[in-house]
């Protein structure tokens, strides 16, 4: 194998290993977005350990513990379980890390409505 091919293979291997690692989104993030019940202001406190995502979600109505959280490359997924008017409500999130300071999410509310939002790293 020529030196150029060896160097190219090493660069490709390094690039793939870096892209597979989960991004570190640990810390506080905030988002203001429109929902079926009006504008909402959320704070997300994320902690990443490998590909596992844990944390809390704080809303004007209280806090919820993040469930089923994963970070795989630039993809972020988790569930928010809460109670709305006395009924359990499951909200699933799937997002892409846009930059070190922004995550673009689509959240699905109880399998009914999709809502788009951008979370920004709190400063």
Located regions from the model:
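Bacterial N-terminal signal peptides that target proteins for export
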Residues: 1-8
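Bacterial N-terminal signal peptides
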Residues: 8-17
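Bacterial Sec-dependent signal peptides at the C-terminal "C-region" and cleavage site
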Residues: 17-23
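Central antiparallel beta-sheet cores of small beta-barrel/beta-sandwich binding domains
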Residues: 23-98, 104-123
């Amino acid at each position: 194998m020529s030196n150029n091919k060896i160097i190219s293979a090493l660069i490709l291997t390094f690039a793939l290993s870096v892209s597979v690692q989960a991004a570190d989104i640990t810390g506080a993030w905030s988002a203001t977005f429109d929902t079926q019940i009006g504008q909402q202001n959320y704070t997300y406190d994320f902690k990443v350990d490998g590909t596992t995502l844990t944390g809390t979600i704080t809303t004007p109505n209280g806090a919820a513990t993040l469930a089923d959280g994963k970070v795989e490359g630039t993809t972020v997924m988790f569930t928010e379980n809460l109670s709305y008017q006395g009924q359990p409500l499951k909200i699933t999130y799937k997002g892409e890390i846009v930059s070190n300071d922004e995550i673009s999410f689509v959240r699905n509310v109880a399998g009914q409505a999709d809502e788009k939002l951008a979370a920004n790293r709190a400063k």
